[in-house]
């Protein structure tokens, strides 16, 4: 894609995101080595580079606000952290809606626009009009149920709980929301790396999620992948379950 001002600013922000995520890792682990490794990896992360530097999609404009919010949470500033994340969500919704409006489709014929979401498993071309209307309500119901459970159990929201919630939400939302584009996993790509730096036993999460994202990009560009997209959808479901179980155990134990 042509290099313009938006693209150049996005590239600068991508490096800023790498520095910010390094600071987040240092805040969580106290390890300068892990913080530097996080920066070094994100500076060459394939899907991050492809999103801005090559493809000019520039999700970084709202994604960096998500991670700024996470950093503020890790430093004990919940109010500013929440505000930063909400600002990122508003920009993300606007960007995705604008992208939908540019598509030359009179009415959606598929619940998938590149990201291997849940509808790959149940049939992305079946009952489109039905799922189109209720899928967001189902997603909202899941989120509200989680909030109610946390409130009912009086779970103490620690730094680690916030990080687990962050990654869980980053995988959950694009997985159950319809019409998600190929770059819908951008936030979870980065969050999974931070998750691994905090809990090294989960080293496979960033690796697997990066494979899914890269395959989604390949499918969007070439119209095909080495494996059926449903395989990546099942893989995402397994990762979502893994992080969800981690979150549940941490909440029960109060970690």
Report the location of each language-model feature.
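Transmembrane-helix motifs of polytopic, lipid-linked glycan transferases
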Residues: 4, 8-29, 141-152
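Loop-to-helix entry region of an early transmembrane alpha helix in multi-pass inner-membrane enzymes
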Residues: 2-19, 36, 52-53, 128-138
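Membrane-embedded helix bundles of polyisoprenyl
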Residues: 11, 22, 34-73, 82-88, ...
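Aromatic/glycine/proline-enriched transmembrane-helix motif characteristic
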Residues: 104-176, 245, 251
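Alpha-helical transmembrane segments of multi-pass membrane proteins
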Residues: 12-15, 60-70, 166, 186, ...
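Transmembrane helical bundles and short interhelical boundary loops of multi-pass, membrane-embedded
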Residues: 92, 96-116, 166-170, 199-255
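Membrane-interface helix caps and helix-loop-helix hairpins in membrane proteins
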Residues: 48-58, 175-180, 221-226
């Amino acid at each position: 894609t042509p290099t313009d001002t938006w693209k150049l600013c996005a590239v600068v922000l991508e490096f800023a995101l790498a520095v910010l995520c390094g600071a987040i890792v240092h805040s969580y682990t106290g390890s300068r080595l892990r913080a530097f490794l996080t920066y070094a990896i994100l500076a060459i992360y394939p899907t991050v580079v492809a999103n801005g530097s090559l493809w000019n999609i520039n999700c970084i404009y709202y994604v960096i606000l998500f991670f700024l919010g996470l950093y503020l949470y890790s430093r004990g500033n919940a109010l500013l952290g929440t505000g930063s994340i909400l600002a990122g969500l508003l920009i993300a919704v606007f960007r995705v809606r604008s992208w939908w409006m540019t598509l030359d489709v009179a009415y959606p014929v598929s619940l998938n626009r590149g990201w291997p979401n849940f509808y790959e498993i149940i049939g992305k071309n079946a009952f489109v009009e039905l799922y189109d209307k209720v899928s967001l309500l189902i997603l909202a119901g899941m989120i509200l149920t989680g909030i109610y459970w946390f409130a009912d159990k009086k779970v103490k929201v620690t730094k680690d709980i916030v990080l687990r919630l962050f990654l869980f939400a980053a995988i959950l939302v694009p997985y159950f929301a319809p019409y998600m584009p190929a770059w819908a996993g951008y936030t979870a790509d980065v969050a999974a790396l931070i998750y691994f730096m905090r809990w090294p036993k989960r080293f496979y999460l960033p690796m697997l999620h990066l494979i899914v994202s890269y395959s989604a990009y390949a499918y969007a560009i070439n119209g095909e992948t080495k494996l059926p997209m449903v395989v990546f959808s099942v893989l995402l479901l397994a990762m979502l379950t893994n992080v969800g179980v981690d979150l549940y155990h941490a909440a029960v134990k109060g970690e």
